Amino acid sequence: METINNRNPQEINTNETMIENPKDKVSNNNFIPKLNLNNNNLNKINQPGDSETLDNRSNPSSPIESPLSTARISSSHNILFKTRGYYFIKPISKGGYGQVFLAITKSNKFFAIKSINKRDTIGKHMVKELMVERNILVQYQNQSIVKLFECFQTKKKLYMVMEFLHGGDCASLLHSLNTLEEREAKNIIAQIVNGLEFIHSCGIIHRDLKVENLIFDKNGIIKIVDFGFSEVGFTGNSIKNGNKKNNKCLGTPYYMSPEVINKRGYGKTIDWWALGIIIFELLSGETPFVGDNQNMIFEKITNYTNEINFPSYFSEVAIDLIQKLLQVDPLKRLGANGADEVKRHPFFNGVNWSKIYSPESLTFKPKIENEYDSSYFFERENVKKTVSAKKTNNKKPIKRYLFKGFNFKKN
């Protein structure tokens, strides 16, 4: 039986850059890679033990000790602060314009709550984006999208109360395993395709699809999160002209398509481009376009001519899928005619699309110890920075009307 990650992946560039890779600097205080990959006959990985690391084991069924600390939240739940009946325990991630905390109620229910500073939102001209995310999560419910339960505000802050997803994001999974085998990644990628198919059917473009915004629930089902940069109102395979309808260059540089960077106009295919980047990253441990700063990354993407150097262990079918998703011409890009043409690609041969969420199909099964277990998230000192509107100094009183309609409570 082949062990997970028994090959030597390409060396990852660990130089500090203007746009940090979350693999470069990591605080290891609160993450345990208690991974349980289940893909047909793939051996299960048990709770970390005493002797071997993830990258240097010979017996895939033996206990594994993580080099990372095993610190956990105590049962006493140290409280950082509280508001509106929610007790905030610890930060678990950062989004495009807010920080996400694990919180508990008096009835012992756990939630992930995004805390957003009103003044920062106004200063970054992100009020519209905030309301777009709120409206998407209120209007659309699907197993591929994180659930929203409540939105409320105080004098200085906005809060979005969402389901707590125990399994951590794909970035944390990569931090633990470095790379995934294609057979391990296939179901994960299929779930992402299904998620994109749903949001595109609703006329939504995510615009910031990346491994940090793909989070596993406790069963191993992927949820798409962080719709702050999303755009709505796309029908069919329409292309929006960036110069006329939206001249903002938004997203995370590593995942941005050439047409977004050049503001030529864009459509749903920018998400399929991002999927191509994500697949490359899942299989190799790094994104295909890297640089010491944002401009260098943009230059590599805009000068890209449909040729990438692939690691030798990539299969021909995986290379073909990635190349077709990273087609420079958005109208020729795989997915331009809808998700069905992506699903028909030979990479997905053998995938039963009606059963990709069944327990026997899921390849990543978190081993959750309790309802407040957040150990699958690793803390990032630096994250991949997003590109958004420039912040302006704004010390004027916050105008309440700007956030009218934000409040929401699910029945």
UniProtKB/Swiss-Prot annotation:
Residues 1-18, 56-69 have a biased composition (Polar residues). PROSITE patterns: AGC_KINASE_CTER, PROTEIN_KINASE_DOM, PROTEIN_KINASE_ST. Residues 86-348 form the Protein kinase domain. InterPro entries: AGC-kinase_C (IPR000961), Kinase-like_dom_sf (IPR011009), Prot_kinase_dom (IPR000719), Ser/Thr_kinase_AS (IPR008271), Ser_Thr_kinase_AGC (IPR050236). It comes from the Eukaryota. GO terms for molecular function: ATP binding; protein serine kinase activity; protein serine/threonine kinase activity. Residues 1-69 are annotated as: Disordered. It catalyses: L-seryl-[protein] + ATP = O-phospho-L-seryl-[protein] + ADP + H(+); L-threonyl-[protein] + ATP = O-phospho-L-threonyl-[protein] + ADP + H(+). ATP binds at I92, S93, K94, G95, G96, Y97, G98, Q99, V100, K114. It holds the Pfam family Pkinase. Keywords: ATP-binding, Kinase, Nucleotide-binding, Serine/threonine-protein kinase, Transferase. Residues 349-411 form the AGC-kinase C-terminal domain. The active site is at D208. SMART domains: S_TKc. GO terms for biological process: intracellular signal transduction. It is an enzyme of class 2 (transferase). Residues 28-46 have a biased composition (Low complexity). CDD domains: STKc_MAST_like. Its EC number is 2.7.11.1. Belongs to the protein kinase superfamily. AGC Ser/Thr protein kinase family. This is Probable serine/threonine-protein kinase DDB_G0280717. It comes from Dictyostelium discoideum (Social amoeba).
